[in-house]
């Protein structure tokens, strides 16, 4: 795994190998996308081959931008690469930061640009099996309840998003 992502080293942003970032728990840039259909959100189950949190459910797309890559461009690129989703224009909702142990001695310490995209009707999906094992649409209220009942089935960042950033991500939907 030689991909370099933007991470802070000694207070300066620098390109650092992705695995090194997680082993050292470095603060780094990330992107998360939530594709919505009304009050339903598309979630993905991470492939078993992923180097951390394999088999756990996460939001639609969660990734790291390449060094020098715009967060919005990254969101569009990874929706296509992970799920085969094209033609969406994700809307930036805000920035959050979290730190979480993701197992295996790895730490996610992310500064995350959050995006949402609304769709109506069906959405053509073509998941990359090296990234995604399964997908499903879930009502955000049911998802929050499932995460509360079965937290071990979900990634730490999805649990954090739903617990601490529901209003930022889902806005008026979270207040219904």
Residue ranges, per PLM feature:
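The catalytic Nudix box helix
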Residues: 43, 60-93
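Acidic, metal-coordinating catalytic segment for phosphate/diphosphate chemistry
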Residues: 1-32
């Amino acid at each position: 795994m030689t991909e370099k992502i933007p991470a802070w080293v000694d207070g300066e942003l620098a390109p650092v190998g992705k695995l090194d970032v997680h082993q050292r728990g470095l603060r780094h840039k990330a992107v998360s996308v939530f594709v919505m259909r009304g009050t339903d959100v598309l979630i993905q189950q991470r492939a078993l081959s992923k180097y951390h949190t394999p088999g756990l459910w996460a939001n639609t797309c969660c990734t790291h931008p390449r060094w020098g890559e715009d967060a919005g461009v990254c969101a569009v690129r990874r929706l296509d690469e992970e799920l085969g989703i094209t033609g969406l224009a994700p809307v930036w909702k805000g920035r959050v930061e979290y730190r979480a142990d993701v197992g295996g001695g790895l730490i996610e310490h992310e500064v995350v640009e959050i995006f949402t995209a609304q769709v109506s009707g069906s959405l053509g999906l073509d998941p990359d099996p090296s990234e995604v094992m399964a997908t499903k649409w879930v009502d955000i209220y049911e998802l929050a309840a499932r995460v509360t009942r079965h937290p071990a089935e979900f990634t730490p960042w999805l649990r954090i998003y739903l617990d601490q950033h529901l209003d930022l991500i889902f806005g008026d939907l979270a207040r219904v």
